[in-house]
Structure formats: C-alpha cells, structure tokens
Amino acid sequence: MNQELLSVGSKRRRTGGSLRGNASSSQVDEEQMNRVVEEDPQQQPRHQEEEHTARNGELVGADPRPGAQNDSQQGQVEENNNRFVSVDEDSSGNQEEQEEDEEHAGEQEEEEEEEEEEEEEEEMDQESDDFDQSDDSSREDEHTHNSNVTNCTSVVDLPINQLSSPFYTKTTKMKRKLDHGSEVRSFSLGKKPCKVSDYTSTTGLVPCSATPTTFGDLRAANGQGQQRRRITSVQPPTGLQEWLKMFQSWSGPEKLLALDELIDSCEPTQVKHMMQVIEPQFQRDFISLLPKELALYVLSFLEPKDLLQAAQTCRYWRILAEDNLLWREKCKEEGIDEPLHIKRRKIIKPGFIHSPWKSAYIRQHRIDTNWRRGELRSPKVLKGHDDHVITCLQFCGNRIVSGSDDNTLKVWSAVTGKCLRTLVGHTGGVWSSQMRDNIIISGSTDRTLKVWNAETGECIHTLYGHTSTVRCMHLHEKRVVSGSRDATLRVWDIETGQCLHVLMGHVAAVRCVQYDGRRVVSGAYDFMVKVWDPETETCLHTLQGHTNRVYSLQFDGIHVVSGSLDTSIRVWDVETGNCIHTLTGHQSLTSGMELKDNILVSGNADSTVKIWDIKTGQCLQTLQGPSKHQSAVTCLQFNKNFVITSSDDGTVKLWDLKTGEFIRNLVTLESGGSGGVVWRIRASNTKLVCAVGSRNGTEETKLLVLDFDVDMK
C-alpha cells in the first residue's frame, strides 16, 4: 500500500503537483497532432485578414468617389476624426498603464506565492530528509522504491526517436506478456487491508463491478466522458464499425494478442497518442475522492517517513498529512506522551493547520539521530565531592542529585552545570537516595534516612529506626521503603516522618528493594528473595533458588526478576512465588538490571550486557564483540531504541536495543584502563549524566553532562 500511494504522489509531483498538469500537457500534444491532420493552417490567417479588411471598410464609411462631399464637410470630418483619435490615444494610454500596474501587482503576488510554496516545500523536504538520513536501511528501501517508480514511468519520458528504435521495439516485445488472471497485491507486515464489505460505495467513487467494463465506460464513470479525444478533421475509415464488432466478438486472450500486434504495427506518434489517452486513467488521485475520515484511515497505514513524503504530493495531501490526530497515534506508538508547542517562523496559510503532535514526533526523531550520530559536543563538567566516591545518582527534570561517601549530597542544575546547594547533615557516607519533584530522600551509614527540600536545602525529617547502614530504598508516592544491613525493612511516611511498618524475616543484610504501592520485594545476602504485604507486615512468598547473595531486583507488578552472585538471573511469578525461568549465560555477578515491557537488560561483572525476553526466557542479544567493555559493567539504562552502559574501563557505550550492535562511545576517560571509572549513569530523553572518578587518584571526581537536544524553532 505504501508504494502504491507514493507512486501516485511521485508522479504527481514530477508533473507539476496535480493531475491537471498531465491533462494540460496532453491537450497541447493533442492539438499539435490535430494540426498535422487538419487543413493548411495558413488558410485561417488569410480569412481573418479578409474579414478584418471588410470590417475596416465598413467602419471608415468614406465614399471613394471624388466630389462626393464639399470642403467644409471634409474639414469637419477630419476635425472629428482627429478629436476621436486624440481621445482614443489618451484612453488607450491610461488603459495600458492600468493593465501594466495590474500585471505588475499580479506578478508580485505570484512571486510571493511561489516563494511561500518554495519555503513550504523546503521545510517538507527537510523533514523527509531527516528521516532518510536516520536509517541506512530506510535509504535502501527508498532507493528501491524510487527505482520502481522510475521503471513504471520510463516509457512516458522516452523521446520519440527512442520509441521507434529497434532496441525499444525488441525489448517491448520481449517484456509484454499476456496476463489472464487477476493481480495479486501483498501487504506489509502488521498492516491489514480494509475489507470492501466494510465500506459502502461513497459518492464520487466508482464501485467495482463483478463483470469487466470497457475503458470507455470507465472514463465515463470517472466524469471524463466529454474529454474523450475526437479527431473531427478525418472521416472514419471504411469498415471501422465492422472491425470493432469483430474485435468485441473475440475472447480476452485473443483481444490481448490483437492489441499486441496492433501496437507493433503503430508509428511512435500513434503509440504516444494511446498513452496520452490511457495513462491519466491510472494516475487518478483516489485519496482526494475519499471522505476525509476514510482518507486519514488509509494514510494511517503509512510509516511516518512515507507520510512525510506523501505530504509533498499536493496541497490536499499535505493538509491530510498534517492531521493532528493522525500524528498523535504515531507518537503513541513511539511512546511520546506530550505534543510540542513551538513558535512558528512564519504564518501558516489558511487551510494548513500546524500539528503539535507532528512537531513532537519530528523533534524526537531528530533527538534519536543526535544520540546515534550527532556531533559529541564538549560536556558540562560539574566538579564536586573532592576525591570521594559518588555512591548514588538521581536525575529528574533539570535537577541532578549526587550522593557521596563524603557524607553530603549536592544538587546541580543540568542546564547551567552549577551546584545549587549542598545538603549537609549526615554523619556517615551516603549510600542510597531517591528523588521525586522537590523531595530528596537519602540513606546513610549513620543508620538514618533524611528527607530534604530540594529547593531550599532544608532537612524536613530525620528518620530513625534502623540499627545499621541504610543500603537501599524505593520511593512510591508518599511512602518510602528502606532496606538495611540490620536485615530489616521499614516503611516510612515521608510527609510525617513516621515509621509505619517494620518487615522482619531476612537473616542477613538487605541489599535491594522494590515497592509498587501494594507489595514490597526484597533481596538479601541470605540468598533469599521475599515478597511482603506491608500493611499486615507478613511475608507472602519466600523465593528460594539462588545459591549466593542477591544483589539486584526488578519488579513490574507481575514478575520479580532477581540477579545473584551465583551468575544466574531468575524470573518469578509474584502471585504464586514460582520460578518461571532461570536465565543463564553470564559468568559473574549481575550488578545491575532494568525491566520494561517484558524486556530485561542485565549488566554483569564479566563485562557483558544481555537483553532478555522474560516471557520466553530467551536471550535476544548479547552486547559484546570488539567494542565491548573491557571491565565490569557498573550501570546501565535503556529505552525503546538504545541501551547505555558504563564500566570500570572508563567508557560509556551506546548500543542498538533491537540489533544489539555497538553504535559508539559517548564517554571515554583519558584515565580509562589505568584507574578511571564511570560509577553511575542517568539519562533522560535529551541528556546523559555520568558520575566519574577513580580509586587511585588518576581521575578527578566529577559529573559529566552531555546534551543531545535539538532546537525546534
């Protein structure tokens, strides 16, 4: 369907953007051919000259006979004639000036309209080019499509001398085949064709009949019955009607064979005439004949890149392709939640409605292109925490929060790179943190949690209760669950600072925790994973199977995924507590994981990253090869397109989520391999924040902020 739509659009664009261009060019060619078979064209000017002379004689009205009038009458006539000529010259001069002014004004308007149209076309071309440049495979598909379109129209563009060449005649004879069956069209994957029975015949459309109709009937049904070519200067040849009756009496294959022989016996000009009559019938813009709702439904099957190309076909197609609801659906497919409202550089013409959803889609596409191959500009460098380790990192909106074993947290601006404030109050190193809006929560080796106001830096609450280091926490709305080396978990109200529940059952330090508002899931050094009901403080399930410490957890409300020092990853059913899959393949500790829509990405101390489908338990990709990390993976994050990973080797790498292919290094520390480490990474749609440093003093502790945003004017 995509190629059929675009082939119509490509032909229309090459011929002037409308079918009227084809009709006008065909009409000119037909008139030229008429003049070949009509009478001598010089006779018409001679008749016009005689008529003009006769009219002049009648208008002058002068008697050529001498003595017919006296001198006074003759003088009066001359005076009147002179006065008439003078007035006529003045009026004609004014009229000419007025016509020149009007013509000049019209030319200016036309030039302005042409300039606006050129700007619109350039803008659409740029949007389409952005999509073309983003994917090599897309460019190959487009090249193949353009080749197909060119092949379909190459006969039309051939000069007459090529049409009459022996090579052309030979190849056309070889290529022409009798096709007695119906044409079978395939549809792209995921795109289901509309059933004809689902729609009634619309006004202006020709319903498909069960029996074949003649080409003349088709032209008449299309409203072009009066446009049929009539050569009136030549009488119908003798026996024409008998020949036509004989032709109609033949079978379908016999008619095709006869047409083949007829075409081979025609001269090039005659073949061209047939093409001019037939071709417009197959270039009809069926989209413009459909009701708008149905036309938009058809266009909704196009990919965004093809939709942008379709917008360049004509004005009506561009209006359809700018439909805001159409682009909203495209945005939903890509996970874009909000439209983009921007200031336009120029006023949109009446009839063209700017689509904020389209702008949002194009902006996101350009951002993805920046991540993939955009120029890596110098990052903002945020220096702080001296030479201490950055143990935790949060990034939300334009605010960055870093926690360190120097007992402090720092709040940074992701826009300016400035340190906005330092949160001081803990008496031990900060090892865990969470952030939402203007609230920051931190856990420390001093056995407390603190709730901070990110705007003012004020400590709102200090939460006491744990008897050892607060090693992990998870925030959900107004509650936070903390896990400690004292083997317990506590549920806190961050608004009041009260401890609501205490969950006891582990026999070793709690290393990781997840909370969805209903259930708490915890992993500990006792090899166990536990599922809790925090309201009743009861353990619903103890998930046994790991043979070493549990270091990482993910929980989506249905599945629990646990990573252990025993090198395995286990997928559990949270309702039954059963182990669904055991994912094997890593060779060491799984230090970090992230789960979205049944896709799990795991990073391991064996320097590899794996992508899994937790429903099937299948490993989809292993991110390795010559460009893989050379040391343990420290942190990772992924979205619908990319996987970002950091490592002890001092690099941050970008990978393709679908193919597993390495794209490029986003960060490479000069001290990488000799002590430089990327401890933590956090990424938004447009920014990447990296916490870097070293354990031997070779790399200064700092934050690096990379920006991949685009300017949508």
Curated annotation (Swiss-Prot):
GO molecular function annotations of the record: cyclin binding; identical protein binding; phosphothreonine residue binding; protein-macromolecule adaptor activity; ubiquitin binding; ubiquitin protein ligase binding; ubiquitin-like ligase-substrate adaptor activity; ubiquitin-protein transferase activator activity
Protein keywords: Biological rhythms, Chromosome, Coiled coil, DNA damage, DNA repair, Nucleus, Phosphoprotein, Repeat, Ubl conjugation, Ubl conjugation pathway, WD repeat
Stretches forming WD repeats: 384-424, 426-462, 465-504, 506-542, 545-584, 586-624, 628-665
One term under GO cellular component: mitochondrion
Domain F-box positions: 284-330
Principal place of residence: nucleus
Modified residues annotated as Phosphothreonine in this record: T211
Acidic residues bias locations: 87-135
Leader sequence segment: none
Annotated region described as Disordered, given as residue ranges: 1-150
Biased composition (Polar residues): 69-84
Bias-annotated ranges (Basic and acidic residues): 46-55, 136-145
GO terms (BP aspect): DNA damage response; DNA repair; lung development; negative regulation of gene expression; negative regulation of osteoclast development; Notch signaling pathway; positive regulation of ERK1 and ERK2 cascade; positive regulation of oxidative stress-induced neuron intrinsic apoptotic signaling pathway
Protein's pathway: Protein modification; protein ubiquitination
Quaternary structure and partners: Homodimer; homodimerization plays a role in substrate binding and/or ubiquitination and degradation. Component of the SCF(FBXW7) complex consisting of CUL1, RBX1, SKP1 and FBXW7. Interacts (via F-box domain) with SKP1. Interacts (via F-box domain) with pseudophosphatase STYX; the interaction is direct and prevents FBXW7 interaction with SKP1. Interacts with cyclin-E (CCNE1 or CCNE2). Interacts with PSEN1. Forms a trimeric complex with NOTCH1 and SGK1. Interacts with NOTCH1 intracellular domain/NICD and NOTCH4 intracellular domain/NICD. Interacts with NOTCH2 intracellular domain (N2ICD).
Description of its domains: The WD repeats mediate interaction with substrates of the SCF (SKP1-CUL1-F-box protein) E3 ubiquitin-protein ligase complex. The F-box domain mediates interaction with SKP1.
Record protein name field: F-box/WD repeat-containing protein 7
Gene designation per UniProt: Fbxw7
